[in-house]
Amino acid sequence: MVCAQEAYIQLGLSRVMLVPARIPPHKPVDEEPGASHRLEMCRLATRGDEERFEVADLEIRREGPSYTVDTLEELHSSKPDSELFLILGADIAAGLPDWHQAERVVSQATVAVAERPGTSREAVMRALEQVPGGETGRFFDMPEIGISSTMLRQRVRASLSTRYLMPDAVREYIDHHQLYRGSSET
């Protein structure tokens, strides 16, 4: 949510739409909770802040593989006068040349890159320049908060507190549904 908030502020966006994937393509996750749980956690994380953030189930409803280009085209059809930004972390943006129909992705939206430790701006720029139109990407600062989704899942699995590290409603949802707890089988 910090990344979404920073993009909203620094890029002067009117709204940020969170679109959870039905099957996350770029980051396989052990004990993946499923699309419906991820969708609900996004809704809980943005509750009370609907003026800035919207959660959409576009990719979850779609049959078959869900590609970013399809989502962007669907958004363009439903919001033809909107300028779209695709918000990505630097690590993901560096892999954009390998995406399905990457050239169409960058023709549909301005790529907005959250700078993160571990992936240099130069590496991302080189990657974006490999995709015709990608050189129009924009960067925004991401504060180093020392919290990652991997770290949060590890803390949940180890029964360590995640209080103050994520929205209370999301933490309570994870606890209630016993998500990310690991398998009881050995």
PLM features: residue spans?
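Nucleotidyltransferase catalytic core that binds NTPs
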Residues: M1-T186
